[in-house]
A protein has these predicted regions:
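A gly/ser-rich beta-alpha-beta helix-loop segment of oxidoreductase catalytic cores
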Residues: 65-67, 71-90
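Carboxylate- and glycine-rich phosphate/diphosphate-binding segment that chelates Mg2+/Mn2+
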Residues: 81-174
Length: 175
């Protein structure tokens, strides 16, 4: 589901507990991965997972998380952040914890071939927007980081349209 919901996190926690799960494998894009991160951090917490979204210091013993990426966009496969929506409270918050960093991520460009054109374009725009956030954050003296961001943006501008026109172009999907 887009914008992973607290209700889905709660169902995931219940499933993990009921079946004594010891590793979570998230398959999909950023929303699936974000949901899995908060599930992993909530399984050994007795309260509501929303508490962890509000205060990540409550994560004490997260389950390990692996990722198979099928939609490139957010970078969630390599970072400690997650965004969860609480529909009851009409809130959408981000949370970060070192234990949310996946233990492994499988990024096979062929797994993205079936992504619809509209989502490929939106994913490219999402990558660019996240890169712009970093680029325009006040980081005096961050010369190297800014050059990396510029390289990412140039790559998106070059390969994004190719991936849209040729969904099974390995080079475009890999870059």
């Amino acid at each position: 589901e887009p914008n992973p919901r607290l209700e889905t996190v709660i169902r995931g926690v219940e499933l993990c507990r009921a079946h004594n799960i010891d590793l979570i494998l998230a398959v999909g894009g950023g929303s699936s991965i974000d949901c899995a991160k908060v599930v992993a951090g909530s399984v050994h917490y007795d309260g509501n997972p929303w508490d962890i979204v509000l205060d990540s210091s409550l994560v004490k013993d997260a389950l390990p998380l692996g990722v198979i990426l099928t939609l490139s966009a957010t970078g969630s496969e390599m970072d400690p952040m997650a965004v969860i929506t609480n529909t009851e409270a009409n809130l959408k918050y981000g949370v970060g914890h070192p234990d949310f960093i996946p233990k492994f991520s499988i990024l096979d460009p062929t797994f993205t071939y079936s992504v619809p054109v509209s989502q490929t374009a939106a994913g490219t725009a999402d990558m660019m927007s996240h890169t712009f956030e970093s680029y325009f954050t006040l980081n005096d003296g961050a010369f190297l980081i800014n050059r990396l961001a510029e390289g990412i943006l140039q790559t998106c501008i070059h390969y994004g349209p190719i991936a849209v026109k040729e969904p099974e172009n390995y080079e475009a999907r890999a870059n």
